[in-house]
Amino acid sequence: MSYPLFLITWEFKSLSCHKHKEIAYKNKLRLKLSQFIFSCMLRKNDESAVNEESLMSKEIVIVGAGFAGMWTALSAARLAKLKKADDISVVVIAPVAELRVRPRFYESKVQTLVSPLMPVFEAMGVKFITGNVTHIESEKQLVVYVDENQNLVTKHYDRLVLAAGSNLRRDMVKGIAEHAFDLDQIDTAAVLEQHLNGLASKPSSQARNTVVVCGGGFTGIEIATELPARLKALLGESEPVRVIIIERNGQIGTNYSQELQDVIKQATDDLEIEWILNAQIEEITAHGLRLCSGEEIQSDTVIWTAGVKANDLTNVFAKQQGPQGRLHVESSLKVVDQSNIFATGDVAYAATDDKGNHALMSCQHAILMGKFAGHNVAASLLDCDYLPYKQENYVTCLDLGSWGAVFTEGWDQKVKSVKEDAKKIKIAITNELIYPPKAELDLIMEQADPLAPWV
């Protein structure tokens, strides 16, 4: 639906004379303006979207440059090279051409936890567009993105791969957006790190020395177990620090095996981390938080780690959405009921085996899913057979701060290693294994093969 531009402009001017009108109304007008511009762009591109260049080549457009997006691009380019298909172009659209190593965002010096992608993209002939995709028009085979100059641009695709990742939910409890820190993106993790580094300049108090972690899942446990040593280093060994994990379930690590739960409990006990179980948070404030039980905890640092959802672009395909907004996909990772759109990584709800297990929102699954998605999206243009995505092996490697780590194998999470031995495995995974390969053609071709050995 489009709106007359003069009417929208008049409404904006009218608002300047009526300051008492709600800000929400002005936001609605911005949305109308965006929709109007978008509809104009679609009409303009309806006849000309397939330009002279695209008539000569077929374009695979990948939205996102995380673990799944990177490997999708490299794998698609790999198959095109193997088939000598010079008419296939692989294009990645993302805000920045770097892999941001999200599994390490609980660590210090977070802004260094990135790896450039242009070397590997250039080695494989992958094109990169700096932009943030805001709309998908599947019937017209168009994506709309905001470029680095804040212009709206349309891009035609022959095949589209959604690899846009996931985001933390900030609407679950009052006060999250205003008062809580998080590790969701590198920028927000950097804000938390800056805040922690600044605590030493504040007078010693119970609130200053107390950190509350909301959510006792993987991310919550890793940041909580990291904090005691970090706080002592920042505030002084003699300062009494307190780290609390708020968990809504009645036991530690509800979704983990009993064996893994026992290790987590031992580690957090040894680190003197407190758990508050069966707890619901009513509100996060500038001075801490209040539980639904009425208990208040004074803290200058509340970290939110609970609740993740797939990128909002999945809302375009509402009929295909499953748990956490992820898209139901076939074994090829093609979105159900979509002829030329694939999904991978956090946005895809994909079966890993025939036993009822599904890929988690983790780099472990995103990396291999990306390789399969890339192969299959290229195969769909080359009239090659699909490779059905399977990932029967599953491991868990949970960092437990200065205590060490724990490493498990299988969906039943049998503990195989703990403490320092597990820590070495964790470091090898997060500091080496998950990073992009060296920008060497033969090496990339080998590692981008979805059937190459992986975890």
Residue map of PLM features:
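Beta1-alpha1 glycine-rich phosphate/pyrophosphate-binding loop at the start
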Residues: 53-130, 222-255, 303
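FAD-binding core/adjacent interface of flavoenzyme oxidoreductases
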Residues: 42, 50-58, 126-210, 303
